[in-house]
UniProtKB/Swiss-Prot annotation:
The gene is tuf. It is an enzyme of class 3 (hydrolase). GTP binds at residues 19-26, 82-86, 137-140. It comes from Borrelia garinii subsp. bavariensis (strain ATCC BAA-2496 / DSM 23469 / PBi). It is found in: Cytoplasm. Mg(2+) binds at residue 26. This is Elongation factor Tu. Transmembrane segments: none annotated. Keywords: Cytoplasm, Elongation factor, GTP-binding, Hydrolase, Magnesium, Metal-binding, Nucleotide-binding, Protein biosynthesis.
Length: 394
């Protein structure tokens, strides 16, 4: 069966659900999908099981990899990524956040903000997300007085991480909305959330005129057709027949794009902001991996050593309790990749939690990098610093 062509009739935006494990992110994602499928006869409703679709997730009942679904409101087309909340999977949440223009923060009304709520807010801020909407979930399980306290607490947190004091808060039960899609009272919270997204989230300016760049999130092979790399186009446009370079981690190599798809539909051209799959000519699955980038030839090069300005999180923010010294070896997260690197300090003997400092980093493998790109620094399963590249050294 021939695939249909994606019709670009509404502005496209990437959003996602973030928040602590078990606060209801996947349930809300499913509730939105079911609600939108009722409004739009062409839309496919995805149940909770469809979104949480890896066997180990079903077994543990938690989301591990970021999952994408699509839906439409009256005004916009949304790609929605359901981000994992589980601590060991936060690196996949970073990949997901790297693809979002705005986020929906889920907080369970019966338990309030938890450590991961804070970590996700910090990561959202570091990944350049400017606006969030709070969804206070599990309203049916919480005492009304507690809900008021949680609301105040969450708004304080949201402000602390640089988001607006006027961030909308939507209250409801995602499980109720998912389970009773025909009941207007149950789905009212989803309706309010979607209206809020259309009105409060700004459509991002897309860098369509810059050279093409896509950070590879996943790679799979389609028998008889070749290898597909998926990810969000960061800048530029891509069409069938164009040459691209695969940059970072391994030797740079050229290939030609033989297909561009989004949500199983064919695209005339992929453009900045789209989550796409690109079919690549003559590339084996083993030749390309998550963390590399696909780019217009000659526009980005791989590097190992750079100077950066970083902010070290305090103990209260979930960071280190003790200082670090020259020779420190954490993981550096750029776009969709994480690489170990060694830190050198200039004119300083150590860096304390809470410090803003300039450091020099040498990574153990080369990755595609640009000046001003932001990154997160993690160690032992937690985010310890965030930074920005000031200058590429070699």
């Amino acid at each position: 069966m021939a695939k249909e062509v994606f019709q670009r009739t509404k502005p496209h935006m990437n959003v996602g659900t973030i928040g602590h494990v078990d606060h209801g992110k996947t349930t809300l994602t499913a509730a939105i999908s079911i609600y939108c499928s009722k409004l739009n006869k062409d839309a496919k409703a995805l149940k909770y099981e469809d979104i949480d679709n890896a066997p180990e997730e079903k077994a543990r009942g938690i989301t591990i990899n970021a999952r994408h679904i699509e839906y439409e409101t009256a005004n916009r087309h949304y790609a929605h990524v359901d981000c994992p909340g589980h601590a060991d999977y936060i690196k996949n949440m970073i990949t997901g956040a790297a693809q979002m223009d705005a986020a929906i923060l889920l907080v369970a009304a019966d338990s309030g903000a938890e450590p991961q709520t804070k970590e996700h807010l910090l990561l959202a801020q570091r990944m350049g997300i400017k606006k969030i909407i709070v969804f206070l979930n599990k309203l049916d399980l919480a005492d009304p007085e507690l809900v008021e306290l949680v609301e105040v607490e969450v708004l304080e947190l949201v402000e602390k991480y640089g988001f607006s004091a006027n961030t909308p808060i939507i209250k409801g039960s995602a499980f109720g909305a998912m389970s009773n899609p025909e009941d207007p009272e149950s789905t009212k919270c989803v309706k309010e959330l979607l209206e809020s997204m259309d009105n409060y989230f700004d459509l991002p300016e897309r860098d369509i005129d810059k050279p093409f760049l896509l950070a590879v999130e996943d790679v799979f092979s389609i028998s008889g057709r070749g290898t597909v790399a998926t990810g969000r186009i960061e800048r530029g446009v891509i069409k069938v027949g164009q040459e691209v370079e695969i940059v970072g981690i391994k030797e740079t190599r050229k290939t030609t794009v033989t297909g561009v798809e989004m949500f199983q539909k064919i695209l005339e051209q992929g453009q900045a902001g789209d989550n796409v799959g690109l079919l690549l000519r003559g590339v084996d699955k083993k030749d390309i991996e998550r963390g590399q980038v696909l780019s217009a030839p000659g526009t980005i090069t791989p590097h190992k050593k750079f100077k950066a300005s970083i902010y070290c999180l305090t103990k209260e923010e979930g960071g280190r309790h003790k200082p670090f010294f020259p020779g420190y070896r954490p993981q550096f997260f750029f776009r969709t990749t994480d690489v170990t690197g060694v830190v050198a300090l200039e004119g300083k003997e150590m860096v304390m939690p809470g410090d803003n400092v300039d450091i020099v980093v040498e990574l153990i493998s080369s990755i595609a990098m640009d000046k001003n790109v932001e990154f997160a620094v993690r160690e032992g399963g937690r985010t310890v610093a965030s930074g920005r590249i000031l200058e590429i050294l070699e």
